[in-house]
Amino acid sequence: LQTDRKEDAMNILITNIGRRGYLVDFIKENADFKGKVFVSDCDNTASGLYGTNDGFFILPKPVENEILYVKSLINVCKQNNIDAVLPVIDPEIYILSNYRSNFSEEGIKVIVSDRRVLDICFNKIKMNEFLEHIGVLYPKTYDTIQNFKSALEQGVIEFPVILKPIYGSGSIETCIVKDIRQLELLFHDGMIIQQRISGIEYGCDIFNTFEGKTIRCVIKKKIAMRSGETDKSITVKNENVKKVALYLGKKLGHIANLDCDMIEEGENVYVIDLNPRFGGGYPATHLSGVNLLSILIKLLEGKDVEPEYDDYKENLLVMKDISLKSVVLD
C-alpha cells in the first residue's frame, strides 16, 4: 500500500486500534479534513481494522519486540506519507515515548507525552506523589499489607478497600476487598490497597496543546462500566470537578488528551486515575459537540485553538451498543 500526499492534507495512523474504529469515523466526518486515516493492529481480527479507514496494517506486538515494532511502524509511515501516529493503548504509548526522536527525524509526529508525564500516569504511587505535591486529593493508599494493617488498627482506614496493580490498565486485577482474610489471599507484590471513596464518579477529557496548555475540558458522569471502559455516561457541568480538572491539566502539562477519573464525595473531589490518551469515554465527549480529534489535527497543522471549557451539550446520555461485522480473511 503506497499513498501519495495531497497538498494541505494530514495523514494519520491510529495504532493498535482494537475495537475503536469509531475514531476513524470521528476524524472523517469533519468536512475540512482532506487527508487519509490509516489504522494498525497486531491482531488481524481486530474489528477496528475493518471500516471506513483508508488502509490497515498488521504489525508486530509492541511489547514482544519493541525495536522490531518501531522499525516496522516507521517503515509503514514512510511508505504511506503518514504525518502523525496516534497510539491508543497504554503499553504502546510508553514504548513509543522512548522513540519519539526516531520518528521526528523522519518528519513524523508521535502523539505521546514526555516520560515524566507517563511515569506519573502509569505508576499509581508516583501519581499519588504528584497529586500530593500539587495539593489534589486522592484515596489513601498503601503498598504493603503491614502499612495497611497499621492504618487499620489506628482507625485511619476501614474495609471495604480497593485492591489494584501499581501499573494497571483496563481495571485488570482491580477488585473490592471486604476483609483481611480476602486481602491476604489476593495481595501480592506490585499491588496497592486503596481507600474506597463513596461518591459520584466522573470521567473527564482534559485536552492540552503541544505546549501543555489546557484548551478543552468535558465532564461526564459515569453510569456503567464494562471491562474497565466506560459503557454508559451522561455529560454534565460541575464547577468543583472542572476546577480540579483545569488545575490538573496545567500542572501535569501533558499533550493532547488526558482521560481522568475522579470521584466527588461531598465537597471533596478525588483523582483516582490518569490515562494520557483517548480513552473509552471519549465518544461521549465527541457526541456532545467537542471534536478533540479535529482540534488535534489543527494543532498538528500549526493552527491556534482558543480555550473553551463549557461549550458542549449537557445531559447527553451516551451508550455503547453491540454492532456486528464480518469480513472474509485472506
Can you name each region flagged by the protein language model?
Residues 117-200, 210-213, 239:
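Active-site nucleotide/adenylate-binding loops and adjacent lid/helix of ATP-dependent enzymes
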Residues 41-45, 90-92, 116, 210-213, ...:
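Short glycine-enriched loops at secondary-structure junctions
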Residues 2-111:
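ATP-binding N-terminal substructure of ATP-dependent carboxylate-amine bond-forming enzymes
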Residues 47-50, 66-71, 113, 119-125, ...:
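Short, charged, surface-exposed secondary-structure boundary motifs
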Residues 173-253, 263-264, 268-270:
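Phosphate-binding site of ATP-dependent enzymes
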Residues 13-14, 84-87, 139-140, 192-195, ...:
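Short catalytic-loop micro-motif centered on adjacent basic/acidic residues
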Residues 80, 237-330:
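ATP-dependent carboxylate activation and anion-phosphoryl transfer catalytic cores
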